[in-house]
Amino acid sequence: MAGTDREKALDAALAQIERQFGKGAVMRMGDRSKEPIEVIPTGSTALDVALGVGGLPRGRVIEVYGPESSGKTTLTLHAVANAQKAGGQVAFVDAEHALDPEYAQKLGVDIDNLILSQPDNGEQALEIVDMLVRSGALDLIVIDSVAALVPRAEIEGEMGDSHVGLQARLMSQALRKITSALNQSKTTAIFINQLREKIGVMFGSPETTTGGRALKFYASVRLDIRRIETLKDGTDAVGNRTRVKVVKNKVAPPFKQAEFDILYGQGISREGGLIDMGVEHGFVRKAGAWYTYEGDQLGQGKENARNFLKDNPDLANEIEKKIKEKLGVGVRPEEPTATESGPDAATAESAPAVPAPATAKVTKAKAAAAKS
């Protein structure tokens, strides 16, 4: 009897909360629709896999940090381009006043439709972020960078004045305000951050990020990006080998790593990453200097194979799909499943689940290799 009374009291309380705050304000977790996590691809298949869900989760706070010239803005611009290609609206809050439109365009960003703000101070920047997020019209907003969100008091004060904790308080207040709105509007916020060193640290890493601790707590994903090697063509440097570590992940297991190439003037080499992962998971075979896919040659040397995949995007998409299907990430909901029933089931089952190998396109690689 007591249990029944408690259940009735709970049901009455739930009903009252719904009347007062609206439907969905409170519910049993089992009543929620089990929808897959929506993501924005990063431009690197290896990083999409390391994130565990196929990309950057929608409606969350993401922090990307690392040393100077490690590829933070490049990685973020690829996410911007992918969000735009999916039909999304993107805003870029350039607090550093350093965004290069030509470089962004080379990475695939539609600069004509990119919403750009170059605020005068940190309060203005975060107020703009808050207003844009609450509009519910954005898919992605980028803040570059946290270190450049200088409080108004610091700008208006004298050089050398002490402003301890101002920026940390500003970030804490802003994140408290926007986190709920991000989730409701399914807007992803990427905060690019810089590294600083703590003085007098004897044990452990002296490195820390700017803006206090609030961003560390509110971020669902934190990415540590580092340049590990310089890529050379002869004696000329043509790019960097980059490693990204997922140091925090609330949507999948953390601490996974991804490596990929960033080419100067071109950004992340998606095709190079596909070749590396294809070899690792057995879809692409390497024999000596030759790379082959399903018995057909892609090219001699990684650079030739990369160029061939770049010229044949359908084949690159096919390899990427097989890799993600094997690893169980990034499966698109619009793909037909074998369990469909009804009048269209026969049609769905007869349609191939994976595109047929592009043998005709692959033969071009043999011809190109023969000429060389």
Curated annotation (Swiss-Prot):
Keyword Transcription tagged: no
Alphabetical list of SUPFAM superfamilies matching this protein: P-loop containing nucleoside triphosphate hydrolases, RecA protein, C-terminal domain
Record's GO cellular component terms: cytosol
Biased composition (Low complexity): 345-359
Presence of the UniProt keyword DNA repair in the record: yes
Residue numbers binding ATP: 66-73
Keywords: ATP-binding, Cytoplasm, DNA damage, DNA recombination, DNA repair, DNA-binding, Nucleotide-binding, SOS response
GO MF term list: ATP binding; ATP hydrolysis activity; ATP-dependent DNA damage sensor activity; damaged DNA binding; single-stranded DNA binding
Main location per the UniProt record: cytoplasm
Location of the region described as Disordered in the Swiss-Prot/TrEMBL record: 328-359
Gene Ontology biological-process entries: DNA recombination; DNA repair; SOS response
Cellular localisation: Cytoplasm
A Pfam family of this chain: RecA_C
Disulfide-bond pairs as recorded: none
Gene3D superfamilies in UniProt: P-loop containing nucleotide triphosphate hydrolases (3.40.50.300)
InterPro entries: AAA+_ATPase (IPR003593), DNA_recomb/repair_RecA (IPR013765), DNA_recomb/repair_RecA_CS (IPR020584), P-loop_NTPase (IPR027417), RecA-like_C (IPR049261), RecA-like_N (IPR049428), RecA_ATP-bd (IPR020588), RecA_C_sf (IPR023400)
Function: Can catalyze the hydrolysis of ATP in the presence of single-stranded DNA, the ATP-dependent uptake of single-stranded DNA by duplex DNA, and the ATP-dependent hybridization of homologous single-stranded DNAs. It interacts with LexA causing its activation and leading to its autocatalytic cleavage.
UniProt family annotation: Belongs to the RecA family.
NCBIfam families: tigrfam_recA
Protein name per its UniProtKB record: Protein RecA
Organism: Streptomyces ambofaciens
Lineage: Bacteria, Bacillati, Actinomycetota, Actinomycetes, Kitasatosporales
